[in-house]
């Protein structure tokens, strides 16, 4: 009984160790604005720059997405206090 509970604990420990890096790699998308599918935008970064954004890149908006979306990086707002 003790060895089976140790084995089960070890399995959960391994799963946690495997999933933690994947979850840590999730990037902050709060500063990204999707503008369209990358297949229809020739140069995502240049298109975003021409649209007054800092730049852009093609990303999979959802982990299980097949298609990539062009997302532009929003300029930080500067507020004077």
Swiss-Prot record:
One of its GO terms (biological process) is killing of cells of another organism. The keyword Secreted applies. It is found in: Secreted. GO terms for cellular component: extracellular region. Residues 1-26 form the signal peptide. Disulfide bonds join 38-58, 44-70, 48-72. Its main location: secreted. This is Putative defensin-like protein 31. It comes from Arabidopsis thaliana. The lineage of its organism: Eukaryota, Viridiplantae, Streptophyta, Embryophyta, Tracheophyta.
């Amino acid at each position: 009984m003790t060895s089976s509970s140790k084995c089960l604990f070890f399995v959960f420990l391994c799963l946690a160790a495997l999933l933690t890096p994947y979850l840590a790699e999730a990037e902050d998308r709060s500063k990204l604005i999707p503008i369209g599918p990358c297949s229809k935008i020739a140069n995502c970064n240049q298109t975003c720059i021409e649209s007054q954004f800092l730049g852009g890149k093609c990303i999979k908006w959802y982990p299980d997405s097949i298609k990539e979306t062009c997302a532009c990086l929003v300029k930080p707002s500067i507020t004077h206090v």
